[in-house]
Amino acid sequence: QAKMVTVEDAHPRQPRCQYFGEELQMDACIHLWFGKTKTALHAAIDDATGQVVGLYFDKEETLNGYYNITHQILTKYGIPYLIKTDKRTVFEYKKKASSKVEEDTFTQYAYACKQLGIHIKTSSVPEFKPRVERLFQTLQQRLPQELRLAQISTIDEANKFLSTYIKRFNDKLALCINNNKSVFENQPSNEKINLILAILFKRVVDSGHSIKYNHHYY
């Protein structure tokens, strides 16, 4: 006998996007990927092709982790149209009590995306970004063993390993990229990328035309 699913629990399968770069899904997964300490793997995957477009390890889920995978995307593919992610990540707006703009992570990332013309959508529902959820399931089955065989023990070693692992993963499991169906805009210059993927600090110019940062005047 077929079991009826309630409307609240029903999540119809989402069709793939038509174009490469039309929608990227981002998230981070804390797991025992290598060694004896859990780390956060930040990931971005293209919805249309299943191509992994960015991977980066950090000690925890951080703005730095998302900036690094965004840097990989911009330098290799260009500017995507839309990024989908979870509300529980640094993409969610949570104003810190200190009111310091540099600690307001959503402001930092959203401003960077606004400068590039990238749209952001967030949701707390896992089915909102099924592609990246399934990616982490696959990576949890495959990646720890490969890192162990490569004798990886540090984050730096793991990130270096990922630079070659992404291509092997995509060649085996993703659809081929059809450049005629790409909506990625042209790659910005390295100088522009470095200026945009930065952490902003609000400072006041004093009467001596100087600013103070980390106890130093400039």
Segments (PLM) and residue ranges:
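C-terminal, beta-rich DNA-binding module of retroviral/retroelements integrases
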Residues: 166-218
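Basic, flexible linker segments flanking DNA-binding modules
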Residues: 1-26, 31-32, 95, 100, ...
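An active-site-proximal beta-strand-loop segment
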Residues: 22-53, 63
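Active-site beta-loop-alpha junctions of metal-dependent nucleic acid enzymes
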Residues: 55-82
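Residue-level detection of beta-strand-connecting loop/turn positions
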Residues: 35-36, 87, 215
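RNase H-like two-metal-ion nuclease catalytic core shared by retroviral integrases
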Residues: 85-87, 98-142, 155-158
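Short, charged, surface-exposed loops that flank catalytic or proteolytic processing sites
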Residues: 27, 146-162
